[in-house]
């Protein structure tokens, strides 16, 4: 593995993250039912700019992501620029890296800052599981294309007569990997069995996540980084995540049946992330530009790493691969971290990654490293809960984690934090953050 250069501009400026914000996260078909991702993105970027009081023309680039894309708005980033009153000349493009999408957006803006092409930009992501591109069957799609080219009514009727009743049924978005046909939950089940992770361990982690997230809200720790939203019919504000089960008990988790391997499985709806709607964004600048504008950064981006592994086995081990690389590039070890935040796609996936981060054998035989990355101290791990509790609007999760970790680092007097996530396609992402 090749060691990267420090994340600084040509002038030696660090990459500052000056602010971050997100919408509350809502379970599918609840508070944001009928609100498309592009509107959620406009909400959060508009409010982020208003709160920051940064001159509108100071933002030179917006990189935004959306995993479940809508055909009518394929470039969500540009639609956000045009829909929030930003300067129409602002460069804007969209990215997608599955569950690590806003990690990618942040990396892209950081690269523009390091290249010197911009001095300030916004990165983020939004997704809606309530507004989905419902498709049609391949047979109907082909006929519709041919009908559009038909010249006579008779030709059109002949084409339609080829269809069977089942060809007319709507086709929901695929939930399986395109290359393998496996669902993420299938891989989570495989990892639970491979690494000996029990149902009780998974339920305990999920319960911990909900308890810590509920406590974070109760103590007011999230109020500054979560906006209040108003959606049609504008009768009631929506200000807090609605997936968190603050009063649940471990016995409640034990009642649920396995969701993927019905007979022998351990992965349930309760120890997995739910389908969620939401958006999140961060403002990045060069350190000198932040000083010019009189801004006090939340913190700095010290390093990042993206990795890719095979999709047939252990597809969700991205954090175990990307974490050591990000630490190496930051010049740090696991012991140097104040906080370690991992995306909880599934409790099984999270526990498997934690196990392998501390495994000498995995480090030597799989990663080709001399020693294990290191055990993750429970006192530093997902201290405010994780995605199982908050929910997971695919493209927004990374920006949530970055903002949340920087705020918590500042509350603790500063230090280093690492945020990491697995993603579909065997991808992994990790970023090292620094705050004072």
Curated annotation (Swiss-Prot):
Pathway: Lipid metabolism; fatty acid beta-oxidation. One of its GO terms (biological process) is fatty acid beta-oxidation. GO terms for molecular function: acetyl-CoA C-acyltransferase activity. The active site is at residues 99, 392, 422. InterPro entries: Ac-CoA_C-AcTrfase_FadI, Thiolase, Thiolase-like, Thiolase_acyl_enz_int_AS, Thiolase_AS, Thiolase_C, Thiolase_CS, Thiolase_N. GO terms for cellular component: cytosol. It catalyses: an acyl-CoA + acetyl-CoA = a 3-oxoacyl-CoA + CoA. The keyword Isomerase does not apply. It holds the Pfam family Thiolase_C. HAMAP family: FadI. Belongs to the thiolase-like superfamily. Thiolase family. Heterotetramer of two alpha chains (FadJ) and two beta chains (FadI). Catalyzes the final step of fatty acid oxidation in which acetyl-CoA is released and the CoA ester of a fatty acid two carbons shorter is formed. This is 3-ketoacyl-CoA thiolase. The gene is fadI.
């Amino acid at each position: 593995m090749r060691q990267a250069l420090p994340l600084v501009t040509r002038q030696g400026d660090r990459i500052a993250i000056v602010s971050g914000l997100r919408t509350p996260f809502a379970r599918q078909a609840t508070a944001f039912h009928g609100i498309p991702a592009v509107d959620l993105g406009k909400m959060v970027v508009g409010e982020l700019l208003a709160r920051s009081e940064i001159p509108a023309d100071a933002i030179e680039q917006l990189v935004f992501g959306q995993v479940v894309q809508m055909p009518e708005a394929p470039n969500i980033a540009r639609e956000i620029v045009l829909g929030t009153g930003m300067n129409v000349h602002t460069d804007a493009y969209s990215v997608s890296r599955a569950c690590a999408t806003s990690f990618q957006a942040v990396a892209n803006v950081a690269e523009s800052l390091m290249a010197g092409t911009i001095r300030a930009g916004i990165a983020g992501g939004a997704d809606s599981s309530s507004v989905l591109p419902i498709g049609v069957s391949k047979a109907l799609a082909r006929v519709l294309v041919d009908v559009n080219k038909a010249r006579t009514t008779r030709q059109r009727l002949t084409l339609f007569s080829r269809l069977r009743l089942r060809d007319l049924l709507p086709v929901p978005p695929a939930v399986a990997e395109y290359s393998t046909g496996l669902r993420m939950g299938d891989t989570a089940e495989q990892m639970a069995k491979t690494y000996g992770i029990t149902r009780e361990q998974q339920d305990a982690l999920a319960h911990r996540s909900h308890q810590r997230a509920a406590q974070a809200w109760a103590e007011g720790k999230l109020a500054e980084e979560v906006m209040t939203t108003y959606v049609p019919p504008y009768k009631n504000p929506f200000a807090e995540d609605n997936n968190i089960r603050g009063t649940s008990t471990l016995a409640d988790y034990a009642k649920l049946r396995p969701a993927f391997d019905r007979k022998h499985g351990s992965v349930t709806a309760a120890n997995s992330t739910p389908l969620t709607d939401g958006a999140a964004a961060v403002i990045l600048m060069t350190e000198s530009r932040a000083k010019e504008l009189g801004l006090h950064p939340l913190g700095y981006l010290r390093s990042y790493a993206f990795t890719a592994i095979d999709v047939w086995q252990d597809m969700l081990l991205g954090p175990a691969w990307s974490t050591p690389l990000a630490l190496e590039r930051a010049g740090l070890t696991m012991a140097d971290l104040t906080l370690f935040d991992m995306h909880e796609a599934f409790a099984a996936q999270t526990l498997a990654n934690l196990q392998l981060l501390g495994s000498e054998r995995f480090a030597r035989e799989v990663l080709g490293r001399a020693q294990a990355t290191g055990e993750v101290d429970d006192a530093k791990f997902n201290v405010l809960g994780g995605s199982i509790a908050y929910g997971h609007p695919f493209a927004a999760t990374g920006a949530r984690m970055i903002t949340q970790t920087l705020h918590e680092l500042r509350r603790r007097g500063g230090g280093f934090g690492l945020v990491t996530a697995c993603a579909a396609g065997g991808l992994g992402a990790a970023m090292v953050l620094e705050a004072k």
